[in-house]
Each structure stands twice: as C-alpha cells, then as structure tokens.
Amino acid sequence: VRLSIKRRRPALTRPAGTPLALEVSDLASVGSGTAARFLGRFALPALCAELDQAGVLPALRTRGYDPIVRIEIGESEHRLLVTASDGRELLIDLRMTEEALPVSEPALRARGIEVLSVLAVEWLSLQDPRAVFTRERPRLPGQTHPGLGLGRQLYSRVLGWAAGWGKDGLVNVPAYFHNAKFYAPPFAFLDSAEQGRFEALRRDLAGVPVAEASAALEAGRVVDAATSEPVTWSPGDMLAALSPPVREYLASPAYAGAVAAARDAQRFRLAEGAPA
C-alpha cells in the first residue's frame, strides 16, 4: 500500500531555499553538528542502520533496487529521501517535524493536558516505480505508482523513535480515506467527533473496495444519507498515543461514548448511479 499523508499546516512546510542534502560520501565535510542529523539525532550512517533494522532497505534490495539514502534539513522540517542508485527513481519520501500540538478536545483539556509533545509525519510517500497496477492492486487516489508495501515497517520504526524520545504520540493527517483505514489502529483521531465520522464512513462503505471508496469520496460521490449532500474528506490529526495520559484518554468511556454518539448520528451512502 502506498501511504500518502500530507499534514495540512502551511506554517510547518519546509522553508524556501536550498536544503542540506547528505549522502554517505558527504559526511567528512559536514562535521558532527546537529545540522547534519535527521531530527537532530541520526547522522546518515545511523539512519541507514535504522532503515536496515526495520527491514526497509533489505526489502528494496530484494526488489532489485540499490537504494541511496539522503537527508534534507530545513528550519523545522527534516526530509528523508530514498532513491534508486541512478537518483531518478524516488522510492521513499518522508518529511517530519517535532512540535508542541495545542489540544482543543475539551475532555482532554479537562484532564489538564493542553499541549502534546509529538513527532509529526508531514508527508510520506512509498512507491515502486517499476511495478504496475493490477486488478488485485488497483490505483489508489494520489498514486502515481503502486506502493512498496513497507508502510507498517517504516511506521513501526518511527513510532519506536517517538516512544524512545518520550513523546505523547506520533501524529499525521491522512490525505485520503484509505490512509486512515489502513493505519487505524494504532492511529485514531484525537477529536472524538472526527473519529466518529470516520467510523461511520468505514461502516457505511464497508461493502465497497477501499480504492473505490476512497476515490468516491475524492470525487464527491459519497453523500449524506439524510440530505444527499456530497461528503468531503477533510480530516484533522490522527494520533498513535504513547504517553499514559493520552492512552488513558483514548481508552476512556468518555471518548468512546462521544465517538459512538457521533458515529451513530451519521449515515452515508454512494450517490445514485455511482459504481458500487
């Protein structure tokens, strides 16, 4: 599955200008400062070791790629790029930030939690330029090439970083319905109303193949069952909770009840004439 996640926070995008691009051969010239480290922690050899241990680079080699890993470092956003050896075939594009996330959910604020310390995935693309789409693996919205099928391995490693660094959670905003469906759990929307809406969509589109359901949402062919108004996919933050207070909140009866109320209050369907 190709994961296509885009955080919709313009202030957090990589600033204009030439970023620092690093390869193994460049390390001698950049010194040992944090400017040369992905997320301020991983020099390129250490980052390659992380990807090796996660099974990401071995999987690419098995498919005939000789992967090259690069880092681009901006003021707030750090970017990990993996390409084929010729540099022309982009395989992995991961952009991340660390941030303090203001909390708006009343039930979470009532627990005294006003800001979350999170590791955030601003963008992630995993693609296999040499693969082809098939009936069994159809094109998903946002895809140029089929996915690598390495999303879980990479996310597991990133989640481990967030846990090891004492973060409250790992955050992303799923660009498409299929992203949210593939990564829940462990991810859930922090806003109980959003989680309820997502669960209602998942329930009512359960009989539709995920690629078709996601495409239908993008095309405005999913409608509110009561009003027949088109439904848009405009999600907020999904969080994989790590700290005990946030885990307890997402497992609480208050959160579950609010999610259930939002889910049960909504019904969706494909528009008349839309392919099922």
State the predicted function of each range.
Residues 2, 6-9, 88, 167, ...:
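Context-gated lysine
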Residues 2-48, 53-57, 68, 195-276:
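Intrinsically disordered, low-complexity, charge-dense segments enriched in Lys/Arg
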Residues 81, 85, 103, 113-145, ...:
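Mobile, glycine- and charge-enriched loop segments
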